[in-house]
Amino acid sequence: MASESGLNGDPNILEEVSETKRDKEEEEEVKKTEKKDEEHEKTKTVPFYKLFAFADSFDFLLMILGTLGSIGNGLGFPLMTLLFGDLIDAFGENQTNTTDKVSKVALKFVWLGIGTFAAAFLQLSGWMISGERQAARIRSLYLKTILRQDIAFFDIDTNTGEVVGRMSGDTVLIQDAMGEKVGKAIQLLATFVGGFVIAFVRGWLLTLVMLSSIPLLVMAGALLAIVIAKTASRGQTAYAKAATVVEQTIGSIRTVASFTGEKQAISNYNKHLVTAYKAGVIEGGSTGLGLGTLFLVVFCSYALAVWYGGKLILDKGYTGGQVLNIIIAVLTGSMSLGQTSPCLSAFAAGQAAAYKMFETIERRPNIDSYSTNGKVLDDIKGDIELKDVYFTYPARPDEQIFRGFSLFISSGTTVALVGQSGSGKSTVVSLIERFYDPQAGDVLIDGINLKEFQLKWIRSKIGLVSQEPVLFTASIKDNIAYGKEDATTEEIKAAAELANASKFVDKLPQGLDTMVGEHGTQLSGGQKQRIAVARAILKDPRILLLDEATSALDAESERVVQEALDRIMVNRTTVVVAHRLSTVRNADMIAVIHQGKIVEKGSHTELLKDPEGAYSQLIRLQEEKKSDENAAEEQKMSSIESFKQSSLRKSSLGRSLSKGGSSRGNSSRHSFNMFGFPAGIDGNVVQDQEEDDTTQPKTEPKKVSIFRIAALNKPEIPVLILGSISAAANGVILPIFGILISSVIKAFFQPPKKLKEDTSFWAIIFMVLGFASIIAYPAQTFFFAIAGCKLVQRIRSMCFEKVVHMEVGWFDEPENSSGTIGARLSADAATIRGLVGDSLAQTVQNLSSILAGLIIAFLACWQLAFVVLAMLPLIALNGFLYMKFMKGFSADAKKMYGEASQVANDAVGSIRTVASFCAEDKVMNMYSKKCEGPMKNGIRQGIVSGIGFGFSFFVLFSSYAASFYVGARLVDDGKTTFDSVFRVFFALTMAAMAISQSSSLSPDSSKADVAAASIFAIMDRESKIDPSVESGRVLDNVKGDIELRHVSFKYPARPDVQIFQDLCLSIRAGKTVALVGESGSGKSTVIALLQRFYDPDSGEITLDGVEIKSLRLKWLRQQTGLVSQEPILFNETIRANIAYGKGGDASESEIVSSAELSNAHGFISGLQQGYDTMVGERGIQLSGGQKQRVAIARAIVKDPKVLLLDEATSALDAESERVVQDALDRVMVNRTTIVVAHRLSTIKNADVIAVVKNGVIVEKGKHDTLINIKDGVYASLVQLHLTAAS
């Protein structure tokens, strides 16, 4: 808002900038309304009882037992005050045979200890177990509801990062709010009520006077809770935004690396962290202020009580024991009310976190895959009709896709949809799958409106194979099995056979059990597609939707898959979306779509009769390129070319669905792993990892010393020192309070005149203590909040920086997937804060309490002090054992939940695939399986913690009994006086209170150790190929000569599959080299190696004769411009995406001219917001062709010396393809260019064509030379194209 006051402050400025002011004000207005909306969002919470909406009867039983335990445990202290009053009178009134009387009271203490032990056990284990169970249920319900949402929800309301963030972060907050904290709150409440009941029974008059301070207490407490809740949700919002940055960056790490975008990602992330830091500090300061006020009120009410109590002893005949019983009962009662604040803040945070989650859980989508309503027929014929359909994508309501679109497809026929990129072809597929409903008009199957069918059933009759196949992080077998519930291995094998996948599957070390990696990154595009086809075959659908299904395959697999598809297309209604006209020739009907209208339809031969028709023009466009070749070849080429026309376009769902926000991350997420189309993979990756885990758990890489973590807080040392001083002051307050109490006890048994003077004096001292605490508390929490929040910010920032600079191979490991790392950054950093800041405060406070306690005790009576001290180790041992137990569990639980969140991450990222295969239940089963382990651990932890917790109370009360008994003996023997006994007792019990508080922190500190280990594992790992390293050579003038000498290479994640052995290739400056070969032969791996995503295992790669390892990495990557098969765009404006190529510093004119060069300017200007159009998560708001053009503009803007085109034009329709190819031809001039392609037209004109097979280059030369080698590999590849096309 500063900018606003700046504008309105100075009238001269106003006149000068009236124009800009108006714009700014408009912006401000927009910001304000956005801000208001956000604020509105921030403060929404659910009512507390609603947190338990998902409890079952067993949970209720546990919660009832827990509640009874909490009440019993809470009454322990008030009952103790009763015994305590008896003790004081026993000591104070009898100067002889004290021991007798005292021992009777001491025995009661022991019984009280036993009762409290049982109650505390019930309390903690009841609440911890029910909390764990309910949180698990909420997690799975949330995922279940997310999976049932309609696709529009994913386009508009959420993204993968947010879902995983909520599942890992918010459920922790919710669990915190309904687990042991509820028990603690009930316990404190019981103490409060019990204390006051006892006080009233013993002496109502004094109690009433003390009660006058309660309204003040309550007000202070309430204020505290409100402030905490407000600031907590503000911080969460900022962290959620930061989590999205992590997800985007890691999900597209190859793009980030290639465009040296690490700095940008880091500064973007840090921006969100700063906001969260500020919120955290405010939260800390306000908490302290609230606590300080509470203590001030408490101590002042003491002062009042002491003074008034003295009066009552003189006037009303109260005894000293009675007065103290009342004071302490009221004190424990009200103190316990003050201690509820951490519980209240946990409740508030949980309620805020639950709001968004529960809102989602209750959301009923318009298109509901779980709904059992709707028709279920015996079978369908498969007539499809779109009738007068009007449609816009929900995420882009102002761009009309269809206006009155109609199309009829009769059952058993094949209809092909052709047209330019973005014309709405794939939208037809989305509507038939019922991913969306049209705004007007109907989609009918067999004459019945699609909306009338039961969604799950109708989807089970429709098979979808799309352009970007989405696989799940599971084995190949599991992936195929998505096609059919409980498919047998035989059926799966048969489907793989039909889809021509069994050849490459059999070659893999684990066969069908090979893991495919996150989003199938361990397979090449062609391999992924064949598995997707097998999955559709297994489903045996009535209606088959092929959205560019064979585009990602090389000629050989394409031919066989096409055959497989032809086989399964028989007697099915088939809708084919294709750019490549060869794919569509044999269709029964071809419909040409242009700008959301059907402009022509008919069979191939019919449509060709009209030479001016749209179809003929499309054909002509595809054939123009070949006019320079002789007629025969032209004939052949047209077919190949068109055949390969989109050959690499990896996917369609994404693309054109993407037109409307589709494929939310489906593929593009990892697209670049396509780089090596590595043919095999390693199932080992995942399995081995599990085996390792038994020997050296990955979750606890190595123990991290607390000093190392503390070192991260070094810059805050001054703040920490101030905080520690305040904490020490806070620690001394309680023991001093003990001295005051014992002095008051003595005063109560003095002669009247002395009694009057003494009570007035001590009352004033109590008030002084109160004012000390209103200074010390806020100081402590404020300073520690600064240090703690800075630490969280620093850890997140350092870790993220480290992660972004890791070599690309690191991200191929399953435990470094974007979901897991996102969860690590968000949860672990916060947990570590507990270890340094918050528990340091607690530790300093406890130490100073203990030291002060000991000094006071030894000065009062050293014999008794030793006896009481002998008891303290018992209390400490109990605390220590408790810590040990807690430690055992949290490590595994963390890894297990990490695996579960990967399942969620996968499913949400591929929501269209999950929906079209009705795989929601399957995903849920996988998820619950992964959650079973952590669940059991949580329960075990609850039981063990309960025992530890109960035992500490038993020890506490027994040691009280022992110390008073010994004190009585000492008084009888004349070794000490009764007020000294109380001084020792109070000093040490206040210290013990401090100890028991610190053991209550233990769940946090044991989690923090594991978190620290996992964070430092990242920080300590040196990136093998680190772009942030500034050393290395920089060449002044890059010519662009590239040479690969004797290169051997295996992907680090798949050490058993050799990609290259002894590969040699030299590329002269300014020349264009095309790499061809089958899918999985390693063509894209060359590009990955040139950008140093990986380093070869042996051999070397040079640029202008200099080995690239010796060059500065960042500089090297700036010399290369990469345009790849699945372009990854960031969820920013088009302008920002293009500028990304130049590190975000490109000028407007550079951006526009690169867009013009890449033929993107035209469509961008046509968009409502032009260059300021947001492209959506992973660019889903643009069609594939549009995304690709933006990606080319991004590569061109950095003016690279070496251009790497990995199937760059494959996703475009003929027209854009031609123009982009022109653009590429223009920018290829004087640049060394490496082209990876399946399509012949793209590579024919290359200066050199290199054919890669079995990891070596088997042929190279110009097209004309290679085509004439008899039985040559190239010639046979070309021949394949021709036969496939004809």
Swiss-Prot record:
Carbohydrate attachment residues: N94, N97, N500, N571, N666, N816, N846, N1131, N1230
Keyword line: ATP-binding, Auxin signaling pathway, Cell membrane, Glycoprotein, Membrane, Nucleotide-binding, Phosphoprotein, Repeat, Transmembrane, Transmembrane helix, Transport
Stretches for region Disordered: 1-39, 625-669
Binding residues annotated for ATP 1, in chain numbering: G419, Q420, S421, G422, S423, G424, K425, S426
Transmembrane segments: 60-80, 109-129, 186-206, 208-228, 288-308, 317-337, 721-741, 764-784, 850-870, 871-891, 942-962, 976-996
Induction: By auxin, and cytokinins such as kinetin. Repressed by abscisic acid and cold treatment.
InterPro entries in the cross-refs: AAA+_ATPase, ABC1_TM_dom, ABC1_TM_sf, ABC_transporter-like_ATP-bd, ABC_transporter-like_CS, P-loop_NTPase, Type_1_exporter
Signal peptide residue numbers: none
GO MF annotations in UniProt: ABC-type xenobiotic transporter activity; ATP binding; ATP hydrolysis activity; auxin efflux transmembrane transporter activity; auxin influx transmembrane transporter activity
Compartment(s): Cell membrane
Phosphoserine PTM sites in chain numbering: S671
Protein name: ABC transporter B family member 4
Source organism of this protein record: Arabidopsis thaliana
Gene that specifies this protein: ABCB4
